[in-house]
Regions:
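A short local loop/turn or secondary-structure capping micro-motif enriched for an aromatic residue
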Residues: 65-67, 158, 263-266
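Structured DNA-binding interfaces in DNA transaction proteins
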Residues: 73-224, 230, 234, 238-242, ...
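Phosphate-backbone binding and catalysis cores of DNA-processing enzymes
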Residues: 1-97, 200-253, 260
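Generic secondary-structure boundary signal with a strong preference for alpha-helix termini
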Residues: 27-30, 263, 302, 336
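Generic detector of intrinsically disordered, low-complexity, polar/charged segments
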Residues: 12, 59-62, 143, 262, ...
Length: 344
């Protein structure tokens, strides 16, 4: 702006969203610069279970009723001395179940975040490619076809027709047991622009594989992300069996936890960024309260607490949305301007 050029430096820019975004980034940098690392140690025990070939790796927990953080090497050495030559035995076994719900279909903001994390797309690139997919792709025999719905939306609402089509597709291709019991909604109580529904494929039968030959590599990757997320949003939760074991060593306790997926649900189609498709599926089935345990070794490692992470495009978009600053459609140009002007 001319005023900013006159008062500070020519070529600078400011704006309601841009200025707040820069303040958020600057505050985070101050936090990082002021951060003082704190030392702590972890301790693992490799434990042989009689009758089992593979040893367990148990993590130090603390005492029977209290979790302990090991702050120094001196504390570590005292604990290691106390657990070196004592009997190890199973103190407690807890079995249970947990579920993980399917994600909601994409809004503009969540698409930008996930594309940044999964595809390493800048927000501006995500919006540019989404615009291409919305405006239309030349598909042989069909002409120019828009393959996704409008890309600027705050809503996770899905039309009844699209919801029914997705459920029918899931039932036919995965089985009725994979179809979600109820439509997923998360708009209640939020200020949203609901003129447009969530970002979704315009036709669920137009699978990524079916249109791949008509798309560029980046168009295909983004379309596949949108298609999978939408289908997953209409599917049942994933279900897991869990086992948690507490192992006693004198006054101290070590823990081992494992989970096994027993019903894939939506994860047969989609896993979010940061997830692993296969979790630890060893259910510790050979372990019971009478199992004979032998400690094979103790392994310790020094760590230091880490400062808050620098903002990425994905985390900055998430923060702006959570604070209610700007609209998702403004995030891409705002972040592009911040980067282009080398403010960060």
């Amino acid at each position: 702006s001319p005023l900013l050029w006159a008062k500070v430096k020519r070529g600078l820019s400011a704006g309601r969203v841009q200025s707040v975004a820069l303040r958020i980034i600057a505050d985070r940098e101050e936090e990082i610069n002021a951060f003082i690392p704190e030392e702590y140690w972890t301790l693992d025990a490799k434990i042989k279970v009689e009758g089992e070939r593979k040893p367990l790796l148990a993590k130090f927990y603390g005492t029977d009723g209290k979790k302990i953080v090991i702050h120094s090497k001196e504390e570590l050495e005292q604990i290691m001395k106390a657990v070196e030559d004592v009997p190890y035995y199973v103190d407690d076994i807890k079995k249970g179940e947990r579920t993980k719900k399917a994600p909601l279909p994409f809004t503009t903001s969540t698409l930008q975040q996930e594309a940044s994390k999964v595809l390493n797309f800048a927000t501006q690139k995500t919006m540019r490619i989404a615009q291409q997919l919305y405006e239309g792709i030349d598909i042989k025999g069909n002409g120019t076809v828009g393959v996704i719905t409008y890309l600027r939306t705050d809503s996770t609402r899905i039309s009844e027709e699209a919801d029914a089509n997705a459920r029918e597709y899931i039932s036919q291709n995965y089985g009725e047991s994979y179809v979600s019991a109820v439509a997923k909604k998360a708009d209640d109580g939020k200020k949203i622009q609901d003129a447009h529904e969530a970002i979704r494929p315009t036709d669920v039968t137009r699978t990524p594989a079916a249109v791949k030959e008509f798309l560029s590599r980046d168009q295909f990757r983004l379309y596949q992300l949108v298609w999978k997320r939408f289908i997953a949003s209409r599917m049942q939760p994933a279900r897991y069996e869990t086992t948690s074991v507490k192992i006693a060593a004198g006054q101290y306790r070590f823990t081992v936890a494992a989970s096994k997926i027993v019903f894939e649900g939506f994860r047969s189609v989609y896993t979010e960024a940061g997830e692993t498709k296969e979790e630890n599926n060893v259910l510790l089935k050979g372990l019971d309260m009478d199992s004979v345990l032998t400690k094979e070794s103790l392994n310790s490692k020094q760590h230091f607490t880490q400062p808050p992470a620098h903002y990425t495009e994905a985390t900055l978009v998430k923060t702006l949305e959570e604070l209610g600053i700007g609209r998702p459609s403004t995030y891409a140009p705002t972040i592009s301007t911040i980067i282009a002007r080398r403010y960060v």
